[in-house]
Amino acid sequence: MEILGERMLLRPLNLSDSERLVSLINASVNELREFMPWMRENVTRKEEDEYLLRAVQEMNLNQAFHFAMVLKESKEVIGVIATHPIDWLNESVSIGYWIATAFSGKGYTTESVVLLLEGLFMELKLHRVAVSTTTDNVASNRIIEKIGFRFEGVQKLAGKVAPSRWKDLNTFALLDTEYKSMRKNLFEKFLGGKYPKVKLA
């Protein structure tokens, strides 16, 4: 599945993305380390290759979806947005994302989340999409709130951000009915009024 928006394209990650992702992550290590549980020190090519192999396998089995966040015009990969394993029985999933520091603050992540929601709700027909972010991750919380996710509560010390360091997590969610009621407004607000184009593999 590929999803095309106004400025962004979401496309499945593949093994050839490894070198680019290593470069982006390591250039953003100081910012990512504070909020990403998998980010300790600089990542190696071997570690990224292993992640991409798992990501491709999960996508092939429809267990989870891992997308490169790509600038539509330049074709540059600038981050990753993905689901955690999908609970197909309950038609629900949680999502996560990161963007390289050099591209943050420009609305790219917000657009990417809206595009992913379109794919999850309208194509995969999921019932519920959730996202958790550390309470002190101001930028991520702002993105989720702008889009219109419903705040569900705080999970006490549920996010591990270092071997012996934990943070509280804000939990947000959207139901399919909630998304459909705000869908047109989201496109007007974040996609220049254009509907996303979803291409199924």
Regions picked out by a protein language model, each given a short descriptive name:
Residues 1-20, 24-31, 66, 70-201:
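Acyl-donor (CoA/ACP) binding surface of acyl/acetyltransferases
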Residues 26-29, 40, 56:
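Residue-level detector of secondary-structure transition/capping positions
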Residues 33-53:
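Conserved GNAT-fold acetyl-CoA-binding loop/helix
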Residues 53-68:
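A short helix-loop-beta-strand connector motif used in the catalytic cores of GNAT acetyltransferases and
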